[in-house]
Swiss-Prot record:
Chief localisation class: cytoplasm
Protein name as annotated: Erythronate-4-phosphate dehydrogenase
Subunit structure: Homodimer.
InterPro entries, per database record: D-isomer_2_OHA_DH_cat_dom, D-isomer_DH_CS, D-isomer_DH_CS1, D-isomer_DH_NAD-bd, Erythronate-4-P_DHase, Erythronate-4-P_DHase_dimer, NAD(P)-bd_dom_sf, PdxB_dimer_sf
Amino acid sequence: MKILVDENMPYAEALFQQLGDVQAVPGRPIPLDALAGADALMVRSVTKVNEALLQGTSIRFVGTATAGTDHVDDNWLQQQGIGFSAAPGCNAIAVVEYVFSALMMMAERDGFQLRDKTVGIIGVGNVGSRLNARLQALGVRTLLCDPPRADRGDNERFWPLEKLVREADVLTFHTPLNKNGPYQSLHMADDELLAALPDGRILINACRGAVVDNTALLRALEKGKKLSVVLDVWEPEPELSLPLLARVDIGTPHIAGYTLEGKARGTTQVFEAFSQYLGQPQSVELASLLPQPEFSQLRLNGELDEGKLKRLMHLVYDVRRDDAPLRRVADQSGEFDRLRKHYQERREWSSLCVQCDDAASAELLQKLGFSTQLL
């Protein structure tokens, strides 16, 4: 059995070789000659999986090591009897930590306490729900907007988008990309929403580029709209708008979910799904795959405050490390993908064990996702 895996999926070759012959290939584009005789295809979000790619091939299973699936025509796969699995939630923690890093950077730059802000979370799925829990643990007021969940009668208080826009200091988007239907999210942040957004707000998009109308956003900023903007995703990719990049506060090359843990979860989830599909179910212990981080232990003396928390978070990951490289090379063809392909190893907060002599601080750090040890 021939299994194609994206060359940037960590641990894929080692895992999938237990099930067949593995060939690592670039994801954008998939070499058509590699598809000849292949039985399974494991991709990331850079690969468009549809009839144009797979018609006439022998592929019988597709796995995507990503939470989002808008790059996959799963309806066509189903019609063809091709098995399919994604990796929901695999990078949710990574995206949450990206958002925190960006907010902490802005808090330091602009002289505010995150606890004093109201954060509007648009899309309360795997990412949004985790972000909500961690913000609430820190004492931050959150407002939630999720029309599908609201219509199902889920046990949360959900806000209409138009009201949330007026109330929240921060808008952070965590929705799938739905191009039509009752829950369309394509260009959710359009001219109308941006006009309604009061000056001085923070707008973050770390889900799908087209959820925010990039042309409308650039137009608003050029006309003097006073917003702090964080964009990890762009419309389109990889040919992002250079004028927009020049005006945002933080711009990164679609790497919010790119922790080593998040990537490894994506690989292991599709590996387990494919092994189940073959009738050879296997499970993988994530910790057995991961190397020791550069910083694995640190002692915190006294009570945790927001300044100390920012330093802890930025010790593990500071979003500014990904902003500067993109600005240096964004005007060069192929560099957006190169930054993603050769992304510097990044770990999650859980990789750092913080030794605490204060029980309340240890409890809070645990709720935020750090490993802790009470002295």
